[in-house]
């Protein structure tokens, strides 16, 4: 009897465990349908939605908790892949947001600030929930490594439950973000149309004025004979050329007068310089002439003295007669 009860208990536990394994990999069909619908939209959406679709596909693969997934979860490969996909998604999302902000320039500052604040909050929620996914997988890896070979069925079940909840939160975040972006894009489109309308309102009166002026000139010209119009053009051209010639002659006369003034000034300055040079030369002559005359007198006296001394030494000396 005890053996029978033991066999029944073993069979029951094996059935429970066998039922648990597919449960980790299986998702309710009602939950999967909206995900598939949203994923189809992501595949044909903006670049940030395509990046989000790649992140979602990788997360679905992780949630299967297959043997390969469990092996990679024990290393840092899964978290590294998720980090790269998260960074790519947020980068594309920021680029798309910046593009919409440029298109929102014609919109009022208050409206643009409010839309930007709401969109930034939705973007932050999506980033936080994606970060929760990565943190939860990192925590699972730490818990598995700490068990040291013990059974990890309970950890896998708890991880699968957490991942399902996080995926639901991510779906809500993405839906909210898409709605905010749609409002943002509608505001940008409205602002662009408003800017074009304002430009059109300013240009239409100018175009009408130009048309009216062209029509007036055309009608006045059409009413004149061709010969009269040619004569009128010739008279205007002749008057214009005479005006240009008169201005040119006046300008040449001014240049000639300026040249004459410059030449007269140069001649005057040259004459002044000649007079100054002659006066300086006369002053030098008056300085040095007395000195030269004095030197000449001294030299003549010296020569006379030398000649006298030479003559005296050359005179014969009388000898003794013995």
Curated annotation (Swiss-Prot):
Which parts are the sequence repeats? 84-105, 106-127, 128-149, 150-171, 172-193, 194-215, 216-238, 239-260
- Positions of heparin binding: 166-169, 234-241
On this chain, the residues bearing Methionine sulfoxide are: 147
| Stretch forming the signal peptide | 1-18
Q: Where is this region: Lipid-binding and lipoprotein association?
A: 214-295
Q: How does it assemble?
A: Homotetramer. May interact with ABCA1; functionally associated with ABCA1 in the biogenesis of HDLs. May interact with APP/A4 amyloid-beta peptide; the interaction is extremely stable in vitro but its physiological significance is unclear. May interact with MAPT. May interact with MAP2. In the cerebrospinal fluid, interacts with secreted SORL1. Interacts with PMEL; this allows the loading of PMEL luminal fragment on ILVs to induce fibril nucleation.
The entry's function note states: APOE is an apolipoprotein, a protein associating with lipid particles, that mainly functions in lipoprotein-mediated lipid transport between organs via the plasma and interstitial fluids. APOE is a core component of plasma lipoproteins and is involved in their production, conversion and clearance. Apolipoproteins are amphipathic molecules that interact both with lipids of the lipoprotein particle core and the aqueous environment of the plasma.
Q: What is this protein called?
A: Apolipoprotein E
UniProt organism field: Ateles geoffroyi (Black-handed spider monkey)
Lineage, opening ranks:
Eukaryota, Metazoa, Chordata, Craniata, Vertebrata
Gene that this polypeptide is encoded by: APOE
């Amino acid at each position: 009897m005890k053996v029978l009860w033991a066999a029944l208990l073993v069979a029951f536990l094996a059935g429970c465990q066998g039922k648990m394994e597919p449960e980790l990999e299986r998702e309710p069909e009602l939950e999967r349908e909206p995900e598939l619908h949203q994923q189809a939209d992501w595949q044909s959406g903006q670049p940030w939605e395509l990046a989000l679709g790649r992140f979602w596909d990788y997360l679905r693969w992780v949630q299967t908790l297959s043997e390969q997934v469990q092996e990679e979860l024990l290393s840092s490969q899964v978290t590294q892949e998720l980090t790269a996909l998260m960074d790519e998604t947020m980068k594309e999302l920021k680029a798309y947001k910046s593009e919409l902000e440029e298109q929102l320039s014609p919109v009022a500052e208050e409206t643009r600030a409010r839309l930007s604040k709401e969109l930034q909050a939705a973007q932050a929620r999506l980033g936080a929930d994606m970060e929760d996914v990565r943190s939860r997988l990192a925590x699972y890896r730490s818990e598995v490594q700490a068990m040291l070979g013990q059974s990890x069925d309970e950890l896998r079940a708890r991880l699968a439950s957490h991942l399902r909840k996080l995926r639901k939160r991510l779906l809500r975040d993405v839906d909210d973000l898409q709605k905010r972006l749609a409002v943002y894009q509608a505001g940008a489109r409205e602002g662009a149309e408003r800017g074009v309308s304002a430009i059109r309102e300013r240009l239409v009166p100018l175009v009408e004025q130009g048309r009216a002026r062209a029509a007036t000139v055309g009608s006045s010209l059409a009413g004149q004979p061709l010969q009269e119009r040619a004569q009128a053009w010739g008279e205007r051209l002749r008057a214009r050329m005479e005006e240009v010639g008169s201005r040119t002659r006046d300008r040449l006369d001014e240049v000639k007068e300026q040249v004459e003034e410059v030449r007269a000034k140069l001649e005057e300055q040259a004459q002044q310089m000649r007079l100054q040079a002659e006066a300086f030369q006369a002053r030098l002559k008056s300085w040095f002439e007395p000195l030269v005359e004095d030197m000449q007198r001294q030299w003549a006296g010296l020569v006379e003295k030398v000649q006298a001394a030479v003559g005296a030494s050359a005179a014969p000396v009388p000898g003794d007669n013995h």
